[in-house]
C-alpha cells in the first residue's frame, strides 16, 4: 500500500521560522515553530544572523516530522515563503555570510535612500520597479554591506559573493549550494528588478554599483527549482517547487486569482494587496506596485498598501495601557461600549503609512469627554484599524479604476468579530474571513503542489480554502460617511501637531 503524500511549507518570518505539513485537502497535519534572536547593533538597526535562521529552519523541519511521524519520503514537494526584503550576502565558495542579514525594518541604510532621492532618481526607480525609494527595500542594504565590509566590493566584482533575500538563502542551503534563484515576488521587492521587462535593471545596478553576478536567477512562483540535498532533509531528496514573499503567498493562499480581488492580513501591521491582473498599474497615491505572482508563463501584478499599526494597537492596550489582559478580550470590551463612536484614536506611533506616508505624525486621541469609558477607548482603538484599511482601499479603487466588491481577510486580528463587522460597515462591502487562517503557508504549499501535480490546477484549489465566515455591511450610508469624515478630520489634526519646538 502506498504511503500518503504531503506538501511541506517553510514559513520563514521576522521573529520565528515555521514548518507546516499540509494534506491534499489543504488541512494542516503537523507544524513546528522556533524563534531566533533579533540583533539591534544601534538605534533603528535590525539584523539577523543568517546561520541562526538556517538552523531554526532545520530545527522546525525536524519538529514537523517528529510531531506527525511523517517521513521525508512522504513529502511530495516543499514551498517556501519568507519575510521580504531582508538581505544576505555570502561567500560563494564557503557559504559563510560576510555580514548579518539586514532586516526589512532596519533603517541603517536610510542615508543611501535619501541620497538617491536628492540625486533625482525617484521617478525613474518608481517607473521601473513600482516602488518608492526607501531603506525598506534590498537595494540600499546590498550597497551598505558592500560599503562597510572591507574588500566586499572587490570580491563582488570578482564573482566571489552572492546576494539573496531569505528565500534565495534557504534554497541555496537546502540544495547545498547547487541552486541560486529567487522568484518574481521577492525580486520585485529588491528595488533592482524591472517589473515591466521582468529583468534585473542595468541602469539601477550601475547607479548603485552592484555587480550583476551577485544576483540570483529569477524564476516563476511555481516550478521545480532543485531538490534538497539528502543530508539537509533527513535523507530525502525532495523538489523545492514553490516560492513567494509572505504577503504575496497570503494573496495566493486566499485564492485571490482574479483582477480586483483584495486580501488584508491583520498582523502587527496590516498588508493590503490587490490583484490587478496582467497590467502593471503605477500608483499616483503612494501605493506600491509589485508582482503578486507569476505562474504558467503569466505574471499577475498587484497594488500594495502597508499600515504600520494594526494588531500592535491591541497589544498597546494590553501591555502599555493595561486596559485589557488578553488581546481577544478587546472584543468584549468594545461590545460593552455605549459610545456613539465619537472617540477617535489615531495610532500613529511610528508615523502614518499608506496613503499618508507621514513619518513625523504621532499618536493622538480625539473626542474624549468626562463620560468616556475604558470600553469606549478600546472600541475606538479597534475602529482605528478599520478606518486605516478604508484609507488604503479607497486609494486602491482610485488608482486601479476597479470597484472592489469584497475584502478577503486573515491574520490574528481577523478573529475579532466586532472588528470584522465594523470593517464591513465602514467599507460598505463584504468581508470574507478564510476558514483556514494559515493563508501564508498555505499559499506556499499551493504553489509547490501545483508544480509537481499534487493539485491538478488552480481550479482544484478553489475547493480547499472556502470562506469561513462572511460579514455583510449593515450600516446606513449617511452614518458610515459621517464616521469616516470624523476619522479624516482626526488624521488631519494629528498631522498638524508637532513635538518640534522650532515649528512655532
Swiss-Prot record:
GO terms for cellular component: cytosol. One of its GO terms (molecular function) is glycerol kinase activity. Pathway: Polyol metabolism; glycerol degradation via glycerol kinase pathway; sn-glycerol 3-phosphate from glycerol: step 1/1. Sn-glycerol 3-phosphate binds at residues 14, 84-85, 136, 246. Glycerol binds at residues 84-85, 136, 246-247. ADP binds at residues 14, 18, 268, 311, 412, 416. ATP binds at residues 14-16, 268, 311, 315, 412. Activated by phosphorylation and inhibited by fructose 1,6-bisphosphate (FBP). Keywords: ATP-binding, Glycerol metabolism, Kinase, Nucleotide-binding, Phosphoprotein, Transferase. It catalyses: glycerol + ATP = sn-glycerol 3-phosphate + ADP + H(+). Its EC number is 2.7.1.30. Key enzyme in the regulation of glycerol uptake and metabolism. Catalyzes the phosphorylation of glycerol to yield sn-glycerol 3-phosphate. Homotetramer and homodimer (in equilibrium). Belongs to the FGGY kinase family. NCBIfam families: glycerol_kin, PRK00047.1. This is Glycerol kinase.
